[in-house]
Amino acid sequence: RSSDLYVVKREINFHIPFGEQAITYSPKSFAGSRHVIRARLALPEEIAARRNLAFNCYDEHGDTGFYPHASANVETRGEAVFAARNAIDGIFENSAHGEYPYQSWGINRDPGAALTLDFGREVLLDELRITERADFPHDNYWVKATVEFSDGSTLDIPLVKSAKPQRVTFEPKRVRSLVLKDLIQAEGTSPFPALTQIEAFGTEVK
């Protein structure tokens, strides 16, 4: 798989996951004895294209030196299958939860949970898409979320019970980061809403 990355350091590292950290990747990802990793500079037309600026299947915890990067103030039990990075890995399978391909961002039942998406530079956003985990009846779902942008503006997003991406568009905003917060879950018996993917569509600042 490939992602468009914004690199701010002269050197970047991707740490090969082992054990519990590996179960959010395909079991075939690091199998066998031959592997290839390849990187190249993006073409001008690729840089100029409107795209999902949140997608990064190589994201990890900590200061990676490349963007986009997802982090959160809470992740369920600190487990890899519920880490913030799962919400930008480009995998939309959401009819179950746990190991690949059903990883998600889990909020550990915390009403104050918030996810930060850092683009590493200013970008021009005009659309967000939220895909909630939909492992019903195990899961609950959110009926409202708030996004706070780095320019100080906020956006309330109404949500419904759905396995599909839920889309909201707005006038282009020049931002470096955003925070998904104030997650209001539906009334019900399940205390387990979760996020499968957040997408942020837009372009580079010209």
For each of these PLM feature ranges, what is it?
Residues 13-114, 118, 137-140:
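Disordered, acidic Ser/Thr/Pro-rich linker "stalks" and the adjacent N-terminal cap
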Residues 1-4, 92-155, 159, 164, ...:
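Aromatic, loop-rich ligand-recognition surfaces of beta-strand-rich domains
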Residues 1-18:
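Long, low-complexity intrinsically disordered regions enriched in Ser/Thr, Asp/Glu, Pro/Gly
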